[in-house]
Amino acid sequence: MKLAIAGDSAGEGLAKVLADHLKDRYDVSEVSRTDAGPDAFYANLADRVASGVIDGTYDKAILVCGTGIGVSISANKVPGIRAALTHDTYSAERAALSNNAQIITMGARVIGTELAKAIADAFLARTFDTNGRSAGNVQAIDEVDAKYNAR
């Protein structure tokens, strides 16, 4: 699995910890940008990573900022992306199993490194069942996405 991990200036440290934690099991690209300027803004970082998921550069991604909220909102602006803010393992599991999320986000100022590792592991260990109970909900999400992005 090709996995992107990125953090802004508040999330870069945790992003690097996660990349190191996962690099032996996944094809990890740690793509944080913390230099000054627009490339380091969390919105632009999330856009680059989410666009990479859509174009197939990455299969899944983990984005980190101070709270996880900014990168989540930003990633979800990219058509076709389902990014979920996760600060516990149950939400991470459900993001994969119930929502077919391609991206999870988390806040470096909200959770510690060991919990972040457990969240990443929980998300990446789960696969969406396209014939499961949640398939209709995910299809409906995709239809809403298509409706507004067709304008």
From Swiss-Prot:
User: Which GO terms fall under biological process for this protein?
Assistant: carbohydrate metabolic process
EC identifiers of the protein: 5.3.1.34
Its annotated pathway reads: Carbohydrate metabolism
Catalyzed reactions per annotation: D-erythrulose 4-phosphate = D-erythrose 4-phosphate
Q: Which Gene3D superfamilies match?
A: Sugar-phosphate isomerase, RpiB/LacA/LacB
Which residues, by range, are in coiled-coil regions? none
Claim: Isomerase is one of the keywords in the record: yes
Active-site residues annotated for this sequence:
65 (proton acceptor)
Instruction: Print the keywords alphabetically.
Output: Carbohydrate metabolism, Isomerase
**Gene Ontology terms, MF aspect:** intramolecular oxidoreductase activity, interconverting aldoses and ketoses
Enzyme class of the recorded protein, top EC level: isomerase
Known role: Involved in catabolism of D-apiose. Catalyzes the isomerization of D-erythrulose 4-phosphate to D-erythrose 4-phosphate.
> Per the similarity annotation, which family is this?
Belongs to the LacAB/RpiB family.
Q: What is this protein called?
A: D-erythrulose-4-phosphate isomerase
According to its UniProt entry, this protein's organism is Rhizobium rhizogenes (strain K84 / ATCC BAA-868)
Q: What is the lineage of its organism?
A: Bacteria, Pseudomonadati, Pseudomonadota, Alphaproteobacteria, Hyphomicrobiales
Q: What would be the name of the gene that encodes this protein?
A: derI
